[in-house]
Amino acid sequence: MQTPEIKEGTEQYLWRRKTMNPGDKGVKRKGSDRQREKMSVIVMAGTEDARRIISRLSGMPWVEVTATATTEHGSDLAEKSGASRTVTGALDSDGLRELMADLDACILIDATHPFAAQATENALRACRETGTIYVRFERPEVIPDGVIRVGSFREAGEVASSLIGDGEVVMHLAGVSTLGDVLRSLEPERVAVRVLPSTSSIEKCLQLGVPPSHIIAMQGRFSAEMNLALLREYRAGAVITKESGETGGLPEKVEAASELGIPVILVERPEVNLEGEAVFGNINDLMDHVLKILRDMGQPGD
């Protein structure tokens, strides 16, 4: 397991089991002689949805929010949204379980991306093993008409390779982490990819052989007009994207491609068994549920 980095305000340090100051930020260890000054909630972040949830929770003075994210960029955004503590780095179920114990967490809110199936499975396992309450925010599915639905990015690359003509490229709008599978069936110079403007994302594209002129480093959600301009500029003959919902800008991508008559290859979400779990597609409903749980537990000092 990669050791995550924890950041509290301006102080940064590496997390090790039992090295976190138990009195820091109002966190107390479990025990009959100790009482939490604040109720600890973990939010698995890295999405716009998570940032909205963090912002809502951070406005409650009796709740302390710890956000986890796989990248420094994700942690920075979570901190700006109001998280009092951020944990940067991938956490497996053991890492999450130890973090829950160190924070004496009441609830874990999983607001990770719909395609972060492994993260969700890790969270479910850790919560079941510790008895921590698990709550999932799941973006409502959006499947536009006319798209080509596939089950994997490798399959998406295979389909795209059969659709583009001479001088055309595949516009990859599904992030750098999925690019390697797509390139199994396509030469790197036949792909243009839009990625976050981070050094790691750009370096990965270059390592995979994508020409620098085909790397579009931008952060958004983008309008249909912006997508349309990019598709025209790069002479896209097909688009690869994933079912990331409205928050992920899927409708705008499909609208732009449809205007140009370009086929859209849509990779469907991986399935995770959430039967019996509290799953919400609306943040207001999720917050109502979480607040009821916290009030039933009793605010600190009750």
Curated annotation (Swiss-Prot):
Q: Give the residue spans that cross the bilayer.
A: none
Q: Give the pathway.
A: Cofactor biosynthesis; adenosylcobalamin biosynthesis; cob(II)yrinate a,c-diamide from sirohydrochlorin (anaerobic route): step 7/10
- Write down the InterPro entries for this protein, in alphabetical order: Precorrin-6x_reduct (IPR003723)
* Listed EC numbers: 1.3.1.106
An annotated GO BP: cobalamin biosynthetic process
Which reactions is this enzyme annotated as catalysing?
Co-precorrin-6B + NAD(+) = Co-precorrin-6A + NADH + H(+)
Q: Which UniProt keywords apply?
A: Cobalamin biosynthesis, NAD, Oxidoreductase
Q: Which domain of life is it from?
A: Archaea
User: What sections of the sequence does the record tag as coiled-coil?
Assistant: none
Enzyme kind, highest EC tier: oxidoreductase
Signal peptide from the UniProt entry: none
Which residue stretches does the UniProt record annotate as biased composition, category Basic and acidic residues? 1-10
Q: Where is this region: Disordered?
A: 1-37
Q: Which GO terms describe its molecular function?
A: precorrin-6A reductase activity
Q: Which cysteines are joined by disulfide bonds?
A: none
Its function, per the record, reads:
Catalyzes the reduction of the macrocycle of cobalt-precorrin-6A to cobalt-precorrin-6B.
The text of the family note is: Belongs to the precorrin-6x reductase family.
Task: Write down what this protein is called.
Answer: Cobalt-precorrin-6A reductase
Q: What is the native source organism of this protein?
A: Methanothermobacter thermautotrophicus (strain ATCC 29096 / DSM 1053 / JCM 10044 / NBRC 100330 / Delta H)
